[in-house]
Design a protein with these regions (language model features):
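Short, surface-exposed beta-strand/strand-loop-strand elements in extracellular ectodomains
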Residues: 55-77
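Intrinsically disordered, low-complexity Pro/Gly/Ser/Thr-rich segments with frequent PxxP/GP/PP motifs
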Residues: 70-103
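C-terminal interaction-tip segments
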Residues: 1-41, 47, 102, 109-127
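Hydrophobic beta-strand residues in large extracellular and virion-surface proteins
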Residues: 48-50, 60-62, 76, 83, ...
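Short solvent-exposed strand-capping/beta-turn motif centered on an Asx-Ser/Thr pair
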Residues: 50-55, 111
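Beta-strand elements of well-folded, non-transmembrane domains
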Residues: 52, 66, 122-126
Length: 127
């Protein structure tokens, strides 16, 4: 059985309206195959960096939950925190990382468009 693979996600902007950033859904297993795959994708988020590339402070919040979600209580990073001009904040997840199954979406909202850059290190595999 193959082991998990490590990937870098981003850089990409965090939108100024709730939008999906990361999800591990397999959209197609199309093709001819003699076996059925009884596995589901899983992502382990190890590290996230949010960088403000502007000359002024900008708020940002990341969430885990439904697609394009920003429900209270699902915040995982930022929680409306102002990221100082030309600065970054980081979050490291302990153990094997923040587990995200196929139904989980990492979403985000920034206080201004094209201001906050998202980057992450993840490990992806199948369960």
């Amino acid at each position: 059985m193959a082991s998990n693979r490590q990937f870098r996600v981003g850089p990409s902007y965090v939108a100024n309206a709730a939008a999906n950033i990361l999800n591990g859904t397999v959209t197609s297993l199309a093709g001819t195959t003699p076996v059925s795959l009884f596995v589901a994708p899983v992502i382990y988020v190890k590290h996230i960096t949010l960088t403000n590339k502007t000359a002024g402070g900008v708020t940002c919040t990341l969430y885990v939950g439904a697609t394009a979600g920003s429900a209270g209580g699902t915040e995982i990073m930022g929680q409306g925190q102002t990221i100082a001009a030309n600065s970054s904040i980081e979050k490291f997840f302990a153990g094997s990382g923040l587990r995200m199954d196929a139904v989980d979406f990492l979403t985000g909202v920034a206080g201004a468009a094209t201001s906050i850059v998202f980057e992450a290190e993840i490990e992806a595999g199948f369960q």
